[in-house]
Design a protein with these regions (language model features):
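Active-site-proximal mixed secondary-structure blocks
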Residues: 1-106
Length: 106
């Protein structure tokens, strides 16, 4: 957590890339990025561990690198996405499987 006057791109070594629809820059190294309009911030909990904020937004445009886009879909095996857990913990997708969703009868 840095104060607002600190350039977190500089700290992280990532490259800022101008967005098309919003003021905030996006991360050039990211293969998939979303530009969003803020709808609501919901505070969850207090100052105790596990507290935080739920940020709700509307995607106004998304960017997908051609390297990970195949047959009209994002190729998860090529993308190799990371997920953020809690604290300093992250995860990788290690197994992909499909479950056919049942269609509700009319």
């Amino acid at each position: 957590d840095y104060p607002p006057d600190v350039d977190e791109f500089e700290i992280s070594g990532l490259t800022p890339l101008p967005s098309e629809k919003v003021k905030a820059p996006r991360v050039a190294e990211s293969k998939v990025s979303f530009e969003c309009k803020l709808n609501q911030i919901v505070e969850i909990g207090d100052d105790s561990p596990g507290a935080g904020f739920l940020v709700i937004g509307t995607i106004v445009i998304f960017h997908i690198d051609d390297d990970v886009y195949r047959d009209g879909k994002i190729d998860i095996k090529t993308l190799k996405p990371l997920g953020r857990l809690a604290g300093n913990s992250y995860t990788r997708i290690s197994e992909i499987f499909d479950i056919v969703r049942k269609v509700r009868p009319d």
